[in-house]
Regions:
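N-terminal mature-domain region immediately after signal-peptide cleavage
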Residues: 14-207
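C-terminal motif of bacterial Sec signal peptides marking the signal peptidase cleavage site
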Residues: 9-12
């Protein structure tokens, strides 16, 4: 099995279990009651202390086989099904996911170490409600190691789940949507060095 290292956002990714600040306990998990799930959601760490880059070890079963069998291809339809599978109770309002992006990514083998490197820029432009500025996003590095599957590292734009800068310790943001992190990834790399990136640009299709 190949060793994998990631340069996602030029941030170091480790398994160091730093305890998040107590203030995170104030953030609700309205639709998640299972103790292990709640503990996982509260284990996220703020990588540089700015509220712009977070990291989490996603240890729950995210029911990938069930999702693949469902055959859903439309984004909001998919996330409603993910909520059905992973939430402990369902909200009255159906899930809505927002996508508005412009980005680039790369994945290359490191000739010296034999590892695989992946990086990307996150230049998403999420406009404010008045259209006069842009919201500060929170990017989330997600580690997954599903039973019987491949370990991977992926990156999520938190704003697509409604999470902006500092959401994790604002005392009010419901952390329940974090259960859908494995399905909100825009790019990632697995332990074999297989990398996928989802990129969007407001340009005409190549002919």
């Amino acid at each position: 099995v190949a060793s994998v290292s990631s340069l996602l956002l030029l941030a170091s990714c480790s398994d160091d279990d730093n305890v998040p600040p107590d203030v995170t306990k104030k953030n609700p998990t309205t639709f998640i009651k299972d103790a292990e799930k709640v503990a996982m959601l509260r284990s996220m760490k703020d990588v540089d202390g700015s509220g712009r880059l977070y990291e989490i070890n996603y240890t729950a079963d995210y029911k990938l086989d069930d999702v693949l069998k469902s055959g859903f291809t439309e984004t909001n339809q998919l996330f409603n099904y993910v909520a059905y599978l992973l939430y402990d109770s369902l909200p009255g309002k159906k899930a809505q996911v927002s996508f508005d992006a412009g980005c680039s990514a790369f994945a290359v083998p490191d000739r010296q170490s034999g590892n695989f490197l992946m990086g990307r820029n996150y230049d998403f432009c999420h406009a404010t409600e008045d259209g006069k500025g842009y919201k500060s996003i929170a990017a989330i590095i997600v580690h997954t190691a599903p039973e019987g599957g491949k370990k991977s590292i992926s990156m999520v734009d938190g704003m697509q789940l409604g999470f902006g800068q500092g959401f994790y310790t604002d005392g009010k943001s419901d952390l329940s949507p974090l259960m859908g992190l494995p399905y909100a990834a825009l790019d990632g790399i697995n332990e074999d060095g297989f990398a996928i990136g989802v990129l969007a640009l407001k340009e005409n299709q190549t002919k």
